[in-house]
Amino acid sequence: MGSTEFTDFNKLQKFYYARQDMGTGTVDLRIPNGGDGEANLNGHPMPTSGKVKAITMLCSGPDTPSTSNDHTWMIRKNGNSSSNTETFAFDIDTDMTNTNGTNYTITIVDGQHGFSEYSFNAGDLLQIRRSSSGGTLDNVNCVLWVMFD
């Protein structure tokens, strides 16, 4: 992956999340260490402070795209959904790239789709969840691209 004007992906660490059969739920993506079910952890502990600099997502499956509504996502720390979160939204039909069949991808950096770089501290648990459903989703993969201080 190359660089953009604002984000040098070669200097970033990536943290992977996924969820199968999301449906219309507002649920956490999981760390897929042998699956992505409820028993899997839903966050990565951060070894030092830093910032989420970018997000890449892949949505796939027969229900994708399902509507022309925005799907709203929330990056949060330590399971707290009420304060100190970063939300962004996109429409699968108009904002994502259809790479093949029912596979749609997007890369979001600072200033796009309502996203601003998101700061965290050492020891924080970094999580992502869909906070508002724009319709049914099948499979979602997400990478949070992080730069440590």
Annotate each predicted stretch with a short phrase.
Residues 60-122:
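Terminal beta-strand-rich extracellular "head" domains
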Residues 3, 24-25, 101:
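Intrinsic-disorder/low-complexity loop/linker signature
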Residues 1-7:
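Viral virion structural and adsorption modules
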